[in-house]
């Protein structure tokens, strides 16, 4: 059992009614009067629906045991993404609504980890940084420096990242997947 105050983004727990829930955001909130509450943005792993809720810090939940298996992202068709286990060559289908954020960071043939809850495939774990190519951005301004405010750049996967002014279309960049931010040129 884990207390609500210990839940952090990325953790998965099971509710009393059997729902498998992943924490997207968690924060302590202390109103002017009264007790502290935990405000959370959560996703139902099975349905993909997201919702906001609050818990008392002492409320307890059953932490879900999630296992991971190395896999390769094959392709996306309609509303399904296809992955292949690197060891057994088994193929897995995951509804894109459950992993739409992760799909912004991976290309076909990328190495990922498939997440299992028992025998049920529930998600994808991606690396902490990835290399993506800039598909489109505003032209560079002559004399631009690193200290500028930056500009938006659309990556080859559709992800939009704020990048320094000197970045041009076609360049490979290292992107932090946890925050969706530019790290460096590749």
UniProtKB/Swiss-Prot annotation:
Main location: cytoplasm
GO-annotated biological processes: peptide biosynthetic process
InterPro entries: Elong-fact-P_C, NA-bd_OB-fold, Rib_uL2_dom2, Transl_elong_fac_P/YeiP, Transl_elong_KOW-like, Transl_elong_P/YeiP_cen, Transl_elong_P/YeiP_CS, Transl_elongation_fac_P
Disulfide bonds: none
Family note: Belongs to the elongation factor P family.
Organism, scientific name: Streptococcus agalactiae serotype V (strain ATCC BAA-611 / 2603 V/R)
Function: Involved in peptide bond synthesis. Stimulates efficient translation and peptide-bond synthesis on native or reconstituted 70S ribosomes in vitro. Probably functions indirectly by altering the affinity of the ribosome for aminoacyl-tRNA, thus increasing their reactivity as acceptors for peptidyl transferase.
UniProt keywords, alphabetically: Cytoplasm, Elongation factor, Protein biosynthesis
GO molecular function, one term: translation elongation factor activity
Compartments where found: Cytoplasm
GO CC entries: cytoplasm
Pfam family membership, one: Elong-fact-P_C
Full protein name: Elongation factor P
Pathway: Protein biosynthesis; polypeptide chain elongation
Domain of life: Bacteria
């Amino acid at each position: 059992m884990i207390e609500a105050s210990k839940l952090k983004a990325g953790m998965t727990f099971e509710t009393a009614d059997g729902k498998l829930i992943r924490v997207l955001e968690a924060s302590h909130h202390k109103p002017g009067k009264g007790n502290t509450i935990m405000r959370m943005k959560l996703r139902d792993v099975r349905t993909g629906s997201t919702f906001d809720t609050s818990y008392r810090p002492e409320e307890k939940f059953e932490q879900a045991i999630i296992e991971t298996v190395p896999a390769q992202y094959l392709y996306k068709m309609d509303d399904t993404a296809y992955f292949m286990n690197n060891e057994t060559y088994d193929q897995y289908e995951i509804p894109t609504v459950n992993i739409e954020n992760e799909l912004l960071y991976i290309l076909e043939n990328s190495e990922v980890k498939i997440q299992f809850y028992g025998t049920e495939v529930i998600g994808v774990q991606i690396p902490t940084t990835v290399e993506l190519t800039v598909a489109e951005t505003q032209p560079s301004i002559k004399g631009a420096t690193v200290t500028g405010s930056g500009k938006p750049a659309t990556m080859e996967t559709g992800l939009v990242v704020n990048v320094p002014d000197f970045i041009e279309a076609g360049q490979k960049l290292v992107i932090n997947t946890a925050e969706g931010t530019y790290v460096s040129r590749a």
